Amino acid sequence: MRTVAHVHGARVGPNDDGWPEDAFAPGHSLLYHYPNAQDAATLWYHDHAMGITRLNIYAGLYGAYLLRDPEEQALALPDGEHELPLILCDRLIARDGQLYYPVSDDPAAPWVSEAYGNATLCNGKLYPFIEVEPRRYRLRLINAANARHYELSLSSRRPFVQIGSDQGLLPAPLERMRVELYPAERADAVVDFSGL
């Protein structure tokens, strides 16, 4: 299956952006140059191959791409095991447990551009669980869904402190009870789990 590497939100030259026709096939390679010469940000990479991007991403060709800079490091944000990239997506899981992507019965329009699943995955897992310590965590939130948007809130009724969005840190932290993410959108937030 052919693929194209694209880092969503990266500032790169046109030859390295992973345009849809710049595909390579299994057994071959292509060298991209990512200078990472931009502010700290939560980006994500995904396939971008013409006509099959939706299928390759549906199959799991995506991931977090985190940029850092001195300004961000000076903020002493939670890091290491206390920094969690969380990539959300929905998938349609058939009765036999296999992934299913809807197909069009219209030969003039073979693509199904918007597909909604019956299950939400986080980092490729159904119903993931992580035990947290009573401290602050940094959540790098990414919506890798085809069409679904998410409205996230915490059952503990604690706020998110949003510190970043698609292209990096916000001018000032923003306390929010809910974070909304539309397809390909990112948010960077800190949550304090102390006292739970």
What are these regions, as identified by a protein language model?
Residues 1-73, 175-196:
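Extracellular/periplasmic metallocenter environments
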Residues 6, 66, 87-89, 121, ...:
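Residues in well-ordered beta-strands of folded domains
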Residues 12-20, 100-196:
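Histidine- and aromatic-rich segments of cupredoxin/plastocyanin-like copper-binding domains
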Residues 15-16, 55-56, 75-76, 94-97, ...:
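Short helix/loop capping segments that flank catalytic or ligand/cofactor-binding pockets
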Residues 29, 60-62, 81-83, 115, ...:
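Extracytoplasmic
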Residues 36, 49, 69, 88-90, ...:
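Short, structured patches in soluble enzyme cores that scaffold and shape functional sites
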Residues 68-84:
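Low-complexity, Pro/Ser/Thr- and charge-rich linker/hinge segments at domain boundaries
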Residues 86-108:
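Conserved, well-structured core segments that form or line functional sites
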